[in-house]
Amino acid sequence: MQGLFNKVKNRNTSQRFVVSTIKKGEELFETAVFAATILYFPKSLSQPELTIQTHSKDEAWDTHYRLTNRLTTEFPARLFQEFAQT
């Protein structure tokens, strides 16, 4: 299975996250954010902090990189709430 994976440390809270985008189907991609330990191992693979499904590769990659960049500088709870509403 192909995908993108990034390790992110939030500057405001020092929390660590793993952002993952994988291909779930022919035209279905899923981006998930997992809370991570100090060594960037996901704390729970079955319960991601946020999950976003998209229908094109370009849209999935844009979502992945936008989440990665914003998660570095913004408060995670606000960011997750914003993305959950859209």
PLM region spans:
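Short arginine-rich
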Residues: Y65-F80
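Membrane-helix boundary/juxtamembrane interface motif
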Residues: K24, A32-F34, W61, Y65, ...
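Intrinsic disorder/low-complexity signal
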Residues: G25-F29, K57-E59, T73, Q81
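Short N-terminal "domain-start" leader segments
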Residues: M1-V33, I38
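Intrinsically disordered, low-complexity charged/polar segments
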Residues: F80-T86
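A short, exposed loop/beta-hairpin motif centered on an aromatic-Gly-Thr core
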Residues: L39-R66
